[in-house]
Amino acid sequence: MSGRLPFSQSFWEEFLMGREGHLPVLPELSHVSKGVIRILGGNPGSMHLQGTNTYLVGTGRSRILIDTAQGLPAWINRISSFLSTQKIELSYVLLTHWHGDHTGGVPDLIARNSSLANKIYKNQPDSGQSPITHGQIFSVDGATVRAILTPGHSVDHMCFLLEEENALFTGDNVLGHGFSVAQDLGRYMDSLRDMASLGCRIGYPAHGAMIENLPGKLEEYIQHREGRERMMLSALTRHRVRGEGTRDERVKYGLTLNEIVLAVYGRLPQEVIEKALAPSLLQVLWKLTEDRMVGFKPGDPLKRQWFALEQRQRNKVRGCRG
C-alpha cells in the first residue's frame, strides 16, 4: 500500500458529490418492497442526502412506522394523506435514535392523531415515550420487526430487522451513499460487526437508496474504518522512529491533526479538512488512544500533538480525553 490515500478513494468525495446534487433522485413516496413503503422527509441536504427516509412496514391495515423525519410540513402532509386514503393505522412508531432529523415529526403525528401519543417507542425514551429493548419484537400483518441495539453513531441507536425479508433498517449506522459518522467509534465498529453477523440480505438506510448488498456494504464500512486506523497509526509510527533520546524527548516529535492529514492524504482544501475530515479523524485518534496504540501531549486542542506508543508503553499508558 502506498504511503498516502488518494483523494478520490475516500469518503469526502461522496460528501462533496452529495453537496453538488449528484445523488440519484428518489421518489417522494415509493413501494420499495411488498411490505415496505419509503416516504422521504422533505429535508434534502449535504448532511441528509436526499432527505431522511421514513418507512411504513407491513401489508395490512395496521402498519409500523420507522422514524418521523425532521418535522417539515411536506412530510407530515404526505404521510397523513397516504394513511388517510389507504385507510392505514399506525400500531407502532419506532425511532432509530434521538437526532432531530429522525424524531422531529413526532409532535406533528400526535397533533394529527392524539392516540399515537402512547405508540412512540425509542431506546432511552423521552418523556411520554415507551422504551425499546434489544430483541424486542413488534408485529403487524406481514411484518415481524426485531429491535437490534447498535450504539456508536449515537448512544441510543437501534436498527430493526424485518424477518419476512431478511432485511435490516440500518438507521444512520450505514447509509445508502457514502459513509456515516460516529459519536463513539469503538462502539460503532462493534455495532457494524454485530450488524454483519445478522446475515441480512438488504438494507433500508435512514438516508439514501436501498442497499441491495448489505453484507458487501458492511464489509466496505468496516474495511474503510480499519484502513484509516492503520494509515494514521503508520504515519505516527513513521514519525516517531525519527526521534531520538528518552520517551519524553520523543513526544516532541508528535503530529498535530493537520500534520497527520498532510502525512496521510497530502494537501487538501481546508474546507474538506474542517467539514469532512477533522471530526472523523479525531474519532479515530481517540479510539487508538483508548486502544493504547496512541498517546497525546496535553495542551491546546488545536495544537495537540499525537504520537504512536511503543509496544512496551501500551500496557502502561492509558489515553484520557482532555
From Swiss-Prot:
Annotated function: Lactamase-like protein; part of the gene cluster that mediates the biosynthesis of neosartoricin B, a prenylated anthracenone that probably exhibits T-cell antiproliferative activity, suggestive of a physiological role as an immunosuppressive agent. The non-reducing polyketide synthase nscA probably synthesizes and cyclizes the decaketide backbone. The hydrolase nscB then mediates the product release through hydrolysis followed by spontaneous decarboxylation. The prenyltransferase nscD catalyzes the addition of the dimethylallyl group to the aromatic C5.
Which EC class is the enzyme in? hydrolase
What InterPro entries does this protein's entry cite? Beta-lactamase_class-B_CS, LACTB2-like_MBL-fold, Metallo-B-lactamas, RibonucZ/Hydroxyglut_hydro, Sec-metab_biosynth-thioest, WH-like_DNA-bd_sf
GO-annotated molecular function: beta-lactamase activity; zinc ion binding
Asked whether the keyword Zinc is assigned, the reply is yes
Record note on cofactor: Binds 2 Zn(2+) ions per subunit.
Pathways per UniProt: Secondary metabolite biosynthesis
PANTHER family per UniProt: ENDORIBONUCLEASE LACTB2, LACTAMASE-LIKE PROTEIN APTB-RELATED
Protein source organism: Trichophyton rubrum (strain ATCC MYA-4607 / CBS 118892) (Athlete's foot fungus)
Protein residues bound to Zn(2+) 1 = 97, 99
Q: Which family does it belong to?
A: Belongs to the metallo-beta-lactamase superfamily.
The prosthetic group or cofactor this protein requires is: Zn(2+)
Residues binding Zn(2+) 2 are 101-102
Record-given protein name: Lactamase-like protein nscB
Sorted UniProt keywords: Hydrolase, Metal-binding, Zinc
Underlying gene = nscB
Record's SMART domains? Lactamase_B
